[in-house]
Each structure stands twice: as C-alpha cells, then as structure tokens.
C-alpha cells in the first residue's frame, strides 16, 4: 500500500485522553500525529466544567508528576479551587477546581498546535490498516482518502463510536451535541471480532445565568489559600498552594422539590431511559435525575450545584440534573427548583449512547491483545471522567512511543499510583457499567495521597524521559531534605515535664501525638524546616508510620508475584491441577505476571501455586 504521510505514532481523538497521549508521545521524541474532527475543539469539556474530585484530583497530580499537561492547564484556567475531605485523613483528601471551559479549551488547543514533534490533522479516522498477513498496526485512513503509515496507533474516541443522543423520543446520531459520530471505525472492530459493549451517559441543560435568582441560594465559595494541581505552578512557593491567589467565582447550591419529583414521575415514560429507547448501561455514580427519583423514591430532595462554565459568560451548569426528558418537560422541571423559577435553557439536557471495547481486551500497557501496536484510552475503555481518560491517555501515549522506538513497555503498578489502580481494575476485572475512580478502590490509599505524587513517581518519569534533569534534581533535593529532617527528629531529644515527671523525648515520638505537628515542635525547642511541604510530609510520615509499615509488608508480598512474568505463549491446558474453567479464564485474559493472574476473578491461590510450579519447571528446562 502507498501511504500519503508517515508518523511514528497516530492518536485518534482530541479529547482529554488524546491530548495526554499525543503530548506524551511527542515529548519522547517520536513523530506524532493527532487526528481530530475539529482542531478548535481539542480539550473541549462537553459535560461538567470541572477538573479533579475524590481520587480524580490525585490522578491529575500523578499525570503532572509524569510531565503531563492537565494540571498546568487547570491551574492556568480555573475559576474556583477546593480541597475535598479536609476534615478527614490525608488518604482521602483531593483537589477539585471549576474551570473556565473556554479558556481551558484554548489553552489545550494552543498547547497541541505548538508542541515539537506533534502535528494536528483535521478529519475522521475511518479505518485502521494492519500489516499483510499479521495482526499488527500499519496505518490509519482519514476521511476515506488520506492514508497515514504508523508504527503505533492510539484510539481515544470517547463517546463518538456509533454515538446517539436521546432527548425524549428524539434520536440524533452524534458523538456530542452538534458533532457527527464515528460510524466507519466500528466496522474495523467488528471485522476483527472485537466485542463491543453499549454504554450511556448524560449531561444536564445549560442555564442562562441572567434568569436565575441567586438571592435565596446557598453560596459555595472556593478555598483560601487555593490549592493547585501542578507541582511546577509557583514552584518557589508551598508546593500545593498558590503563591499568587486568583479571583475565585462562587458556585451556588439549590435543591429539587416535591413538584420537581411529581413532574419527573408523571413523565417517566417519555424519558429515553425509562421509555425503552436506551439500551446502554449508565454510570452508577452519576445517575440522571429521573434515575435518582426512581431509585431513591423516599428522598425528599436532591442537591443541585449551580456551576459557572466560564468566568465572564452567562452559561450555568446545573450539576445533578442530567436527564433525557423531552425538552418541553425539561423547562417545566427546571423551573420547579428554587432560584430557577424563571430560568431560560440555553441548551437542552440529553443522554448519549456509544460503543466501547471491553478493557479486558487490553494488556496493562493499554495495548490490545488482538492487534499489536493498537492502544485504547479514555471513555472508549468504559471509564467516565476527564481525569480517568487523561491518565489512560498518558500511559497509552508513552507505550505507543516506546513501541515505535523499539523499547520495553511501561507499566504503573497498583501500589505506585491511582492510574495503576484504574488500569489494573479495567484490564483485570473489566466493566459492566461506566467506571469511576474512588479512593476506596485502592488497598494502598494511605500511600497514594494527594500530597506525594511527584515523590512517588519522579524517578520513573525521569527514567522514561518525561521529566527534565532540572525537575528531577529539584524533587530529589526535596526527598533528601525530608529524609534529613526525619533523621534529625529520630535522634534529637529534649527534656519535657509530663504528669510531674521529667523525661527525655525525641521529636519523632512527640510527632506521633495527634495534637502535635511539626510547627508545634518549636515550643519544645526543636528547629523546623522552612518548607511547609517538607513539614507536611514529615508529619504524615511519622503519624501514620505504623500503617505504612503494614502497607509495605502487604506490598512486598504482592510485588513478589508481580515480578514473576508469564510467557506470552504459555499453554495453560498443560499445567497440572488447573480446572477447565480456570484454563479458559487465563487463556482469555492473557495475564502478563503472576500478580495479574492472582487478581483475576475465579483464580484461586491453588491455581497460582500450580502456575508458579509450572514456570519453575520451564525455567529448569531452559537452564
């Protein structure tokens, strides 16, 4: 075949997964193309105008630790910043920000258009070419005419694959409102026998701010000082709070009423969801308002957050009110809510159905098991959220570039990052509904905190080529400083009087007390670090040292299994002691390590022992 263009890596889709995939690939020095229908819509926020949230905000900081862009973008374009769960322990805290969605989009458009090694090509990816007589990527077709050769292809099509919008009984083929769906690419997947699942999500109407009465509503301001997402924003200041405070725009809170619920109940049969038009599975943790009314019928009211979509614009996003009701019923429903009695809808709410490929079709590198050099990321893997998509995009983009360079693939383990937890969940367990990340999904959540992503990941990022030497040395120095102060606090002692007795106590032991932090050590005659960030890390490390030790021991056991690799060509039917069911599951899943195999549903400890014995036999035979 004659190709018109040639790139090392081609990324299909300019959403949040596609952006991080393309930027990561380009950063590793390979010639990269990003194919998108409209370059001016790169980085668009089609649903909520926000970045972060529980676990999701930590993912953004992990992306940043690998040199990704999402954290920098939201720091530059956010209009309200909060830290969630501040009254709880450090394991569950997480940053969240309201974005000026137009400024965020412009930031990302500018970034992809001005990145070395990256070219943006407008058009629809209509086919993926394979090498003759093999299941290996060779190129991509655009608009049924342009042929692009590629060593690796990353598919990040979001909700576009055979996407259909539902508003009441209206059915509109679309990938997003006013954007055509991808109808050609699904043929490639069907032809190769990839299974497809049908998922559904939705978005609320957009409201005209000028027609809302905010006077009786509860104001929800941002935090002061405002948290930030990128370690490198104001780096000379406290590492997770801004030096230069930005003006923050408040959100407002209102609630549904019994009248709201009556309108919805009387029109349930007219919704696409309950009227039978939608067959796709919707997100459990972000249900439509009609779903809430049905499933929580005894609840008197549901919270609605009124979130500005831009700093100076008129559009308000009513978080909590997505629906597939007919448009005329939507007007009635929205106007039954306090503050919205005279509201004007700028755009109607809608539900959208789309196809995904089950993520069990992927290795933990996000490469497909059926086709070499083909990677998937984002909603196409069955996840929800910009942050989950971006995290997958980063991993897929790095691995696509490494493959093009002929290098070994890259993995993130469960104990290293929430990105690793998510990818392991997806590729091991699969999805029966849109997947959302929570801190509760991780057994290592005390280690995977919001304050330490760069400390956890900077060495791995630097070794990959995703961080500069200057960045590496900056973080290394912080890590060394934390270690120095911990040594000082273990060894330095002061005499204190307690219950009439004088005794010698180390700073380390004092810090174990819940009422004493690093700053309070001054009262006992100890010196303290200048950096607030170093002080915070010391405080957490000491107070939770017992829990960390427990996590470390558990981690050692799991890492032992993770380090035992399983050959790609292994024949499980030849392993004594495995049942037929176990053989079928292992053959389908193709686990890369014994740890991966151990996490598969239905794989018993006895089966893992049998595989380990078999691998030891193979090793002896080769010796």
Curated annotation (Swiss-Prot):
The keyword Flavoprotein applies. NAD-binding protein involved in the addition of a carboxymethylaminomethyl (cmnm) group at the wobble position (U34) of certain tRNAs, forming tRNA-cmnm(5)s(2)U34. Homodimer. Heterotetramer of two MnmE and two MnmG subunits. GO terms for biological process: tRNA methylation; tRNA wobble uridine modification. FAD binds at residues 13-18. Belongs to the MnmG family. GO terms for cellular component: cytosol. This is tRNA uridine 5-carboxymethylaminomethyl modification enzyme MnmG. Keywords: Cytoplasm, FAD, Flavoprotein, NAD, tRNA processing. NAD(+) binds at residues 282-296. It is found in: Cytoplasm.
